[in-house]
Regions:
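Membrane-interface "cap" regions at the ends of multi-pass membrane proteins
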Residues: 1-27, 56-61, 65-90, 245-249, ...
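Membrane-embedded translocation segments of transport machinery
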Residues: 2-6, 168, 172-320, 324, ...
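Inter-helical loop and helix-membrane interface segments of multi-pass membrane transporters/permeases
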Residues: 3-4, 32-36, 66-91, 104-164, ...
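Loop-to-transmembrane helix boundary motifs in multi-pass membrane proteins
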Residues: 5, 11-13, 19, 145-146, ...
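Select transmembrane alpha-helical segments in multipass membrane proteins
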Residues: 5-16, 41-44, 83-97, 145-151, ...
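Transmembrane helix-boundary motif of multi-pass solute transporters/channels
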Residues: 11-48, 197, 235-241, 252-255, ...
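Membrane-water interface regions at transmembrane-helix termini and the short interhelical loops
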Residues: 32-36, 84-100, 135-139, 150-174, ...
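C-terminal membrane-solvent junction of multi-pass transporters and transport-like membrane proteins
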Residues: 88-91, 95, 338-350, 385-446, ...
Length: 491
């Protein structure tokens, strides 16, 4: 069966950017930027995007375009016979499922709050009322299940139409609308009375604050955010590489996608931070920022139901473009592994994702007593930990090693593939960095993530979990150490 391709270069860029643009751009980046020193943090963040995020993305795109498969079959297609690289494909397969087990729930929240905002539910409400409304939603399992199932059905429905007629067409519209809505919201926010203090907090370099937090913490914060913002590591980008033509070099395409993702993150800050300062509300991070702080602000603004509705519409688009991208990856797994048709793969995957999403939904109500990562944690926290702290960095490490090691795809084959076509050429002189420096950075992010997560729980807990982290790391490195049959014969 002939491989589908994108209808246009713009379609590929917007679909891939839609996958990269996610909720973290909104509920994490602006707060981190203000907290870690404003413009100085942004500069460090951009450096790490260039030296770490973009190279990993190029690796994913390259493996996808060369193999013409999802991660479920990409390694088998390119690896030398006798090697074990294909075992690491399960990082991508499992990663996409685990990501959707909680991201569908979050997407459902966005859709529900979009409807509530346009309906005027928050007009005139105080902080206590808004906060109680969020708690009531979390405690209402049927309501949460409904919105989770609805957004899953819509997402898989789009994927059922294929790349050009479904995903590309919808993502073009949603990403364009998302950017336009963000521009309108940002202009409205920065023009609020008192917004200037927020803009200064957001952008002006505060080296004194950086020194108080610790330069090392600021650098690691920027490095981590740059790594996690691009949805790299679980094959979500690889699948779109497999639908690409060979008329464009992949380095330039990765830069374009990263620029779009960064624009969205920066604009989110212009929407949120000035508005918080204008109304004297402490800007925070995470779900409380989105579902309590922001509705409370729009409750006080003239025309708040419109502005609030637009805000949650843009968030719904951001969540939905990511959902559709990962759904396509999941559908492709079945098509590659079992030879199923797109229609059958879509239906089976939809049913499976709905079932797998229910533990996350129930983790806030029926299963609220289950705290897998310590007091106050939820099933969503566990699923997020599995994806963000494990599968994303381990999967990324696997791609980089595969593209640079002689017993993998190899540096020469990698360069030959990614430099086909027009556009910016990937520098061949950084082989040493790609082979040793970049893997080391990824390993540092991975182990530091474990340390930060479990260090507050005490030495015994920390040591136990660090052993687990090292075992997972050993698994990936072990898969990269096998010799090909050709090497064995030569020996």
């Amino acid at each position: 069966m002939k491989r589908e391709t994108f209808g246009s270069r713009l379609g590929f860029i917007l679909v891939s950017a839609g996958c990269a643009v996610g909720i973290g751009n909104v509920w994490k980046f602006p707060y981190m930027c203000g907290q870690f020193g404003g413009a100085a943090f942004i500069l460090i963040y951009l450096v790490f995007l260039l030296i770490m995020g973009i190279p990993v993305m190029v690796c994913e795109f390259g493996v996808g375009r060369a193999s013409r498969h999802s991660v479920a079959a990409a390694y088998e297609t390119l690896e030398p016979k006798g090697t074990k690289w294909h075992i690491t494909k399960w990082i991508g397969v499992i990663g996409c499922y685990f990501l959707m087990m909680f991201y569908t729930t979050v997407g459902g929240w966005m859709l529900y709050y979009c409807v509530r905002s346009f309906r005027g539910d928050f007009v005139g409400a105080d902080m206590k009322t808004v906060s109680a409304g969020f708690s009531d939603m979390l405690g209402n399992m049927p309501l949460m299940a409904f919105w989770t199932i609805l957004i899953s059905i819509i997402g898989f429905g789009v994927c059922a139409f294929g790349i050009q007629k479904g995903i590309e067409k919808v993502s073009k519209f949603m990403m364009t609308a998302l950017l336009l809505i963000m521009i309108v919201l940002a202009i409205h926010s920065v023009m609020m009375k008192g917004a200037g203090a927020g803009i200064r907090f957001y952008l002006i370099p505060d080296f004194k604050q950086m020194a108080e937090i610790g330069i090392g913490n600021v650098i690691f914060g920027a490095m981590s955010r740059a790594f996690f913002t691009l949805s790299i590591g679980i094959g979500a980008m690889l699948i779109f590489g497999s639908y690409m033509e060979k008329d464009q070099r992949l380095f330039g395409e990765a830069v374009n996608i990263t620029v779009l993702d960064t624009i969205v993150a920066l604009m989110a800050g212009f929407i949120i931070i000035p508005a918080c300062f204008a109304y004297g509300i402490e800007p925070g991070a995470g779900p409380s920022l989105i579902f309590i702080t922001i509705p409370n602000i729009f409750a006080q603004v003239a025309g708040g139901c419109v502005w609030g509705g637009l805000f949650f519409l843009f968030l719904s688009f951001a969540a939905f473009t990511t959902l559709v991208a990962v759904f396509e990856n999941i559908i492709s797994f079945d098509m590659d592994l079992f030879g199923w048709s797109r229609k059958k793969s879509t239906l089976v995957s939809l049913i499976l994702i709905i079932i797998l999403s229910m533990p996350c939904v129930m983790g806030f109500n029926v299963l609220a007593g289950f705290t897998p990562l310590g007091e106050g944690s939820t099933i969503m926290d566990l699923e997020d930990f599995i994806v963000s702290n494990n599968l994303l960095p381990l999967g990324s490490l696997g791609y980089v090693l595969f593209c640079t090691k002689k017993n993998g795809w190899g540096w020469n084959h990698f360069l030959e593939e990614i430099n086909q076509g027009e556009g910016w050429k990937f520098p061949s002189g950084i082989k040493g960095y790609m082979s040793y420096g970049l893997p080391l950075l990824i390993i540092i992010i991975y182990l530091k993530g474990y340390y930060d997560k479990f260090q507050p729980m005490g030495t015994k807990v920390l040591v136990g979990w660090m052993i687990v982290a090292i075992l997972f790391l050993t698994f990936v490195i072990g898969c990269s150490c096998g010799k090909s049959n050709a090497e064995k014969v030569d020996k």
